[in-house]
Amino acid sequence: MAIVIVGAGTAGVNAAFWLRQYGYKGGIRLLSRESVTPYQRPPLSKAFLTSETAESAIPLKPESFYTNNNISISLNTQIVSIDVGRKVVAAKDGEEYAYEKLILATGASARRLTCEGSELSGVCYLRSMEDAKNLRRKLVESASVVVLGGGVIGLEVASAAVGIGRRVTVIEAAPRVMARVVTPAAANLVRARLEAEGVGFKLNAKLTSIKGRNGHVNQCVLESGEKIQADLIIVGIGAIPELELATEAALEVSNGVVVDDQMRTSDTSIYAI
């Protein structure tokens, strides 16, 4: 039996690291649905978008870390269910993994658009390395880029895109960018810097639909009636917690997995971080 960690992002990898640091000698198995060893997500919205050379700088830990610390890692492993009675998690391919203790480190997924045209080709999200590589390719092919959302990730993407000569417009529903994370003064400084780089802004603006041509995006339509040319739309409108496993296992959830002061869920054999 082992401690099984579902999710190999920063939280999952560091959980494994600190278990070893604090002397845990039992088995540790990291389960990742991605095809590459665990990596840092923040760089994905920066230099990674415009340079393949940035890829070598983002692993969370060197591969030797997992071997040296006797941590098993299974890639391409999407967990689809938890059998709390048997203490087993099941992967999409049918493989099962028994646990003594289970740690859910499943993170969040990008919030999706639901407006007309949101399923057209050229509407992109940024969450994983695969997303970033796809976006990098599309940036090369696109002249006009619309970034939907004026948060940190959206503005970083806008800066990267304008830096390689793309015409970039940021659409933000709030009266200022980064409204939830910084003061108005700081937000104005960031906006001024990006405007100096060539980024355009539409504030207090709501996207109502996306128009396309031959199945690909070509225009954003705002509530005001204004239309903005777009070869590529990058959506950065927040994230939603991944609760499917916890809900299916009948764990207590409330805008996230409910835990106590030791990160235990309503099932004392399962933790969530």
Residue ranges and their predicted role:
Residues 1-72, 160-182:
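Beta1-alpha1 glycine-rich phosphate/pyrophosphate-binding loop at the start
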Residues 6, 97-107, 228-238:
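Short hydrophobic core segments
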Residues 9-13, 35, 108-110, 130, ...:
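Residue-level detector of alpha-helix initiation sites
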Residues 45, 58-59, 144, 153-209:
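Rossmann-like dinucleotide-binding cores of NAD(P)H-dependent redox enzymes
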Residues 91, 104-105, 147, 222, ...:
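Redox-cofactor binding/interface segments in oxidoreductases and associated redox assembly factors
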Residues 106-164, 259-261:
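Glycine-rich dinucleotide-binding loop and its adjacent helix/turn
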Residues 119-140, 214-221, 226-273:
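FAD-site-proximal beta/loop scaffold in flavoenzymes
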